[in-house]
Structure formats: C-alpha cells, structure tokens
C-alpha cells in the first residue's frame, strides 16, 4: 500500500485505497483487440479453450525482457499444479498460460476463423456421438431379436419333444390295452403245465370242473372279437380263434399278421376235437351228485383249451397239443360229470347288425359282450398271475400269490359286479323287445339270438370261474401239513394266502382279531351272495325256456339267496336234468349247512358250491348243444 501523505483531510495526513478494479475485457480479448462479451470465462475464451484472465486496471507494465521463457514456463506449471483456474485476482502473482502467451498478438482474421471452426467441430462430435449411440442401439436390438429367435426355437423343440412324448405315451397305452385284453392266463396255460389244484383233476371224469372253457368259446361267432374289441388286431383276438375247434375265415387285418413262418393252423387243431352224445349213467355214494359218466370208447375230450390246464407247444407251421395232469385234492371229491358235446358253429353272417333299435324288424346287437369278454380276461389274470420279478429285497424261493386266495375271490366278485349288472339290463331289454315283437307279429333274426347266446355263454363262464375258485379255496383251507405238500400246494403252510394276510381297516384304523374275522366273513358272504344271484339269473332263463314235462324232467326247487346260502324255497317250473340226478341230491345241494369260507369249514361242508358247479355244468351243456333260452 502507498504511504500516507501529510497535509490532507485536515489532519495533515491522507490515505490511498488499493486499486482492485479489473478491466472490462479479459487479457485475450484485450490483446486481440476484440470486444469481450464479459463473463468469467467469456464465450470467446470458452470456445477457443484459452484461460480467461482479467488484469487489474491501470496497472503498471513491466519492462520488456524482464522474464525469459524458462521463467514463464515454470510459473505456468506452478499455476497448473496449484489449480489456479478460478480467475480470481492475485496481486502478488500474474500467471499467463502458453496459449495466452502464444496468442498475445493474434490477428483479428485468425481469431474469427477459430471461433467459427470450434462450433462446427462440436456439432460434428455430437453427430458422431449420436451415430455411435444409434449403432449401439441397433446392435442391442439385433441381439434381442437373436435371443427371441433362439427362445422361439427352443420352445418349438420343446413342443416337438412333448408331441413325441405324447405319441409315445399313446402308443404305450394302446399296447397296454392290447396286452390287457390278452391275459397272462393264455401264455401261462399254454407254456406251463397245470399248476393249480383247480384244473389238475379235470382229467378225472368225476369232477364238476371237467368241462373246458374252450368248449364255450367254440360256440362264439367268428366276428365276435372284432365287433366287441375295436377293429385293431390284438393278441387276444389272435389266440382265441386259433383255439376254436372249427376253421374260420380271418379278416384281412388278421390274415396279414398270421401269414408268417410260425403261423398257427386252426384246422390242424380241429382234428383233435371229436364229439359224441353217447353216455351211460353211473351211481356214486349219497354224499355226492349222481351224474352220468362218459363212455371211454366213444368219447374223446379235447386235448387243449383256452382257459384250462392244457399244455400247448407251438412249432414252425404246426401245432401240437398235450395235456399235463397233476395230483389234486379235487380228485378225492368223487363228483362225477357228464361228457360235453361240442357243436361247431355255422359261419358268421356277412350282414351287419345295426346298433340302434330298428322299427321292430331286427334285434339289435347285444351291448354287454365287451364287458363280459373283458371280465373273463381279468378273472383269468387273477387265477394265473404273472411270476414276480426277483429284486434285491426278495428271495428266489418266494412264490406269487395263490390263484385260489381270498384276495383273488373278493377282487374277482368286485370286478364282476358291473358286467353282471349290464348283462341283467341286457336281458330285460331283450325281453321287452321280444314282447314288443310278439305283439306286432314281427320276427327276430337269428343273428341277434346268436349274440344273446354268446353273452349267456360268457356270463356262465364268469360264474364258473368264480365258483371254482371258491371251491378250490375251501378245499385248500381244509388241508394242512403233509396234505399240502403231498398235493403240491406248496412247500410250507405259508404258501396259502388265507384270511390272515388280508388287511381290513375302517377309517384308517386296521382291524384285528375277531372283529377282523367278522368283517371278512361279511365280505365273503356278500361275495357268495352276488355269485349265487348271478347263477339264479342264469337258471331263470333256462327254466323259462323249458318245454312241457317229459320222462326225463322233474320238479326242481327255485333257489334263492339268503345269508349267503343257496336255499330251496318253492317247487316251480320244470327243468330237464339227467335220470340219475335224484331229488335227494338236490336236497343235499340246498341244505342249510353253508358255513362261510373263512378257515373253519369241514370237508363235508363243500357240497353246496360243488352242487352249484354241477348245475352250472348242465346249463352250459345246454348252451353248447344249442338249446333255446327264453330272454323274456
């Protein structure tokens, strides 16, 4: 600050203020002699990138050559290092940049061209940045599109895989359905000898189980299997026609599958079947039925059957049939039977039967046939279960469940409920159509009657399978210890699947002891009641179709079901029976000693089920012989 001068302001002294005012123009504009618009920094310095600095007004200049270039550069580096870019006034130091020193004396024309070039460069840079951003945005869009395309391709591949899986599942379901129609009983009975005690005694003529189920199949129509179980070829439809005793004409779909080296010739098997109606009566003790026995010189039983215990082996282009017999406790029963005459059916008619009710001229096709055919297959699966596959947790000596177990009986009756009910409805509908045709004097064709006879044969076959299972189960329970091993029931008593292995639960609580036994008794009683009611339906059809009494007919009691018993209630309608079947035998059949099959039955309490099997034997014989059954 300047020193005070005396003699002023009345006090003899005066002070001076510091001159801190800045110039109106910055140093760059001042040197270039252009109008400075003002501001810190000014627009011109901002565009040119020069440091804008305002000098103090009325400042004395320094002499030329006081500072050399090295000093200026050092000061410039010092000012840059200290960050002196605020533009504030520092009186002790005046810093100039290299650009300010270089442009200390610019020409007016050059400064204006620089001012015009800087905005153009800035605009170009902005355009370039925008173009780069657009390119990046386009690249991102392309990447997103590629990702979307990849996702769509993956979805299409997944859909194709799902469709392939669905097709594979459908094929498996179709194969399972076809395999389900072919029960394991076919392969079991055709590849293995008779292993159960049921049909092991079928060779003996004193057993109610002597008639083969194959004889019932012999009366079925040729096109029955194709009409009742889709038009596709199944293993069931391939085996059953081969077991028929008469040659048949296969459809084209079947012939194409049978024309190979190992084709089975049904005509060759038919030569092994013979029929005979000669029989002679024989008598037995009072505890059993007195039924006629066949003449061994004139009667020849078929050597194979579909559901019997026959052992059939196949070779290329030929078929050989042989029957293997085994010891059975059924042989001890001394229940004789009569020979069965097999009547081959006539060729099937080519006329199609309508599915809807016509104007009272043609009888519609029986609708209960598919259910009865499926029921026979299911019952045979229960009687002949497939052998279990040995796993790590099982022992090789473990045997499958017995075909005459309590579980199989109860499950078989449960499976038969719906088909039997459908058969009853079919009987009622057929009777109504017959009465309607009689009122309007219309004639029913033979095709409808054949379908009814086929359904009735399958119905009788299902009853016979269940009754024979019950009969064998009761016999098996009466045998213990050495008798079981002697008659090939198993190596130990544990092989018999008795009531102890059946689990009974109510509301999630398992029952045991006497309560469990009572519940099992009730279930078995109901099962036997349903089977007896089904047999009664068959006998009612046979009784209504009987003609006037002859020398070979007698009054037979109409059987009713009460508390699981097969009882006689009234003497009604004539029923043709053999001469040797006495009323005492029927009385024994209808006796009250019908205890349940739950382990306490004695050997002498088996006449009831055996008698029902005998009655069923003669009823099915009438079916095979072509007897007319009343469907009203």
Swiss-Prot record:
Keywords: DNA-binding, Metal-binding, Nucleus, Transcription, Transcription regulation. Induction: Expression is significantly up-regulated under xenovulene A producing condition. Residues 101-129, 270-311, 324-356 are annotated as: Disordered. Residues 112-129 have a biased composition (Low complexity). GO terms for cellular component: nucleus. It is found in: Nucleus. GO terms for molecular function: DNA binding; DNA-binding transcription factor activity, RNA polymerase II-specific; zinc ion binding. It comes from the Eukaryota. Disulfide bonds: none annotated. Residues 26-52 bind DNA. Disruption phenotype: Does not affect the production of xenovulene A. CDD domains: GAL4. Residues 101-111, 270-286, 294-306, 329-340 have a biased composition (Polar residues). Xenovulene A is a natural product exhibiting little structural resemblance with classical benzodiazepines yet is able to displace high-affinity ligand binding to the benzodiazepine site of the gamma-aminobutyrate A (GABAA) receptor and could be potentially used as an anti-depressant with reduced addictive properties. Transcription factor; part of the gene cluster that mediates the biosynthesis of xenovulene A, an unusual meroterpenoid that has potent inhibitory effects on the human gamma-aminobutyrate A (GABAA) benzodiazepine receptor. This is Transcription factor asR4. It comes from Sarocladium schorii.
């Amino acid at each position: 600050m300047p020193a005070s001068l005396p003699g002023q302001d009345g006090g003899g002294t005066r002070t001076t203020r510091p001159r801190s005012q800045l110039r109106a123009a910055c140093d760059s504009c001042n040197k270039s002699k252009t109008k400075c618009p003002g501001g810190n920094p000014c627009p011109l310095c901002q565009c040119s990138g020069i440091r804008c600095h305002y000098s103090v007004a009325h400042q004395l200049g320094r002499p030329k050559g006081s500072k050399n270039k090295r000093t200026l550069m050092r000061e410039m580096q010092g000012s840059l290092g200290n960050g002196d870019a605020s533009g504030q006034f520092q009186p002790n130091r005046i810093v100039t940049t290299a650009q300010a020193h270089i442009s200390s004396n610019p020409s007016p024309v050059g400064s204006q061209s620089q001012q015009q070039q800087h905005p153009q460069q800035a605009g170009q840079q902005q355009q370039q940045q925008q173009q780069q951003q657009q390119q990046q945005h386009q690249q991102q869009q392309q990447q997103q599109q590629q990702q979307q395309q990849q996702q769509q391709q993956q979805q299409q591949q997944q859909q194709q895989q799902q469709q392939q899986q669905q097709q594979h599942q459908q094929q498996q379901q179709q194969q399972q359905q076809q395999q389900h129609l072919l029960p394991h009983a076919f392969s079991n009975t055709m590849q293995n000898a008779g292993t159960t005690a049921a049909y092991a005694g079928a060779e003996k003529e004193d057993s109610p189980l002597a008639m083969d189920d194959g004889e019932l199949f012999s009366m079925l129509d040729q096109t029955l299997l194709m009409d009742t179980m889709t038009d596709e070829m199944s293993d069931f439809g391939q085996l059953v026609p081969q077991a028929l005793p008469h040659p048949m004409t296969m459809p084209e779909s079947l012939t194409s599958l049978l024309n190979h080296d190992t084709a089975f010739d049904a005509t060759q098997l038919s030569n092994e079947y013979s029929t005979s109606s000669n029989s002679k009566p024989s008598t037995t003790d009072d505890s059993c039925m007195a039924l006629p026995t066949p003449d061994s010189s004139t009667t020849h039983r078929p050597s194979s059957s579909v559901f019997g215990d026959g052992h059939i082996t196949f070779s290329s282009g030929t078929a050989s049939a042989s029957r293997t017999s085994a010891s059975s406790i059924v042989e001890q029963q001394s229940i004789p039977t009569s020979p069965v005459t097999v009547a081959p059916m006539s060729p099937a008619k080519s006329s199609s039967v309508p599915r809807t009710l016509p104007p009272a001229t043609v009888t519609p096709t029986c609708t209960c046939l598919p259910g009865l055919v499926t029921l026979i297959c299911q019952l045979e699966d229960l009687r002949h279960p497939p052998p279990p596959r040995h796993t790590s947790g099982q022992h090789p000596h473990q045997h499958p469940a017995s075909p005459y177990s309590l579980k199989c009986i109860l499950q078989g009756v449960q499976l038969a409920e719906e088909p039997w009910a459908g058969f009853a409805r079919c009987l009622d509908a057929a009777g109504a159509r017959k009465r309607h045709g009689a009122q309007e004097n219309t004639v029913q064709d033979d095709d409808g009657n054949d379908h009814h006879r086929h359904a009735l044969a399958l119905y009788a076959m299902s009853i016979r399978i269940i009754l024979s299972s019950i009969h064998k189960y009761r016999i098996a329970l009466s045998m213990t210890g050495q008798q079981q091993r002697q008659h090939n029931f198993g190596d130990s008593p544990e092989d018999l699947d008795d009531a102890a292995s059946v689990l009974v639960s109510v509301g999630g609580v398992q029952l045991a002891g006497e309560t469990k036994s009572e519940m099992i008794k009730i279930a078995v009683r109901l099962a036997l009641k349903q089977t007896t009611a089904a047999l009664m339906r068959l006998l009612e059809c046979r009784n209504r179709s009987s003609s006037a009494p002859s020398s070979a007919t007698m009054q037979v009691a109409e059987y009713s079901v009460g508390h699981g018993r097969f009882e006689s209630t009234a003497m009604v309608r004539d029923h043709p029976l053999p001469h040797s079947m006495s009323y005492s035998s029927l009385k024994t059949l209808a006796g009250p000693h019908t205890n349940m099959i739950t382990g306490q039955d004695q050997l002498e309490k088996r006449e009831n089920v055996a008698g029902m099997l005998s009655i069923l034997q003669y009823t099915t014989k009438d079916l095979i012989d072509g007897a007319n059954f009343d469907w009203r």
